[in-house]
Amino acid sequence: MKTKAFRLFIALLVIQTFLFAQSEGMVFIKGSRYIPLYGRDSTVVEVKDFEIDVYPITNAEYENFVKKYPKWQKSKVIKLFADTSYLSNWKNDLELKASEKPNSPITYISWFAAKDYCECQGKRLPTVDEWEYVAMADETTKDARKKPSYNKQILAWYEAPRFNENTIGEHQKNAWDVHDLHGLVWEWTLDFNSVLITGESRKDVDKDSNLFCGSAAVNATDLMNYAAFMRYAIRGSLKAKYSMKNLGFRCAKDINLK
């Protein structure tokens, strides 16, 4: 009896320590090995434990950032690090236009700016593998990629106009307790330009032909591949200084074991 009570005490202590250690506004992601889609020759990718923001970074959060770090204000940013669209939806260096909502995701943001924002918070941008790992969850399942309902919902979001005007948190959280990975804006990743899609890639399923030909019925795997193809295609078209209406970001963080 004493042994069971001691084990229970230790388990509760570990859980309590973990909860207190989890960074504010972030959730812990238990790493694992998984097979990503598109663009890699290796079969399995290993993702280590990490934390990720629950929500994308908002206009209000980025407004506070540029007040603290003036070099990222729209009139002061070095053009090498941001194109002419950078913060083009802002009224001036420190104010949003009246049409913009403080709690909407920040967009018109370059990779350089997003990366520096995260680093100034003691964080970093998530890698492609980390982002895809968390994003393959639906509301109940951490790998929902083979569920037709999951893939059809994502494709419906992709086919509709981007919703950068909407506020964060309107979509139900996924099984990791993360919101808005799909259906709000595209998101920068740390290594966005590390993946190229070619017909020679082992996982470029059927040389992409089934994704675009109507000769056969579209099954769950086709939808899964097509959704992934669209994400990788967007990433492959970007350059680090680009700023787009429908491109935002969130931050991640390594787990530091002491």
Each PLM stretch: what is its role?
Residues 44-48, 164, 233-234:
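Flexible glycine/proline-enriched surface loops and loop-helix/loop-strand junctions
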Residues 39-42, 175, 234-240:
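Short, P/G- and charge-enriched loop/turn segments at secondary-structure junctions
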Residues 28, 92-232, 245:
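Functional-site microenvironments in short loops/helix caps that host divalent-cation chemistry
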Residues 4, 8, 60, 64, ...:
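Residue-level signal for well-ordered alpha-helical scaffold segments within enzymatic catalytic domains
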Residues 22-84, 109-112, 183:
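A short glycine-rich, aromatic-capped structural motif
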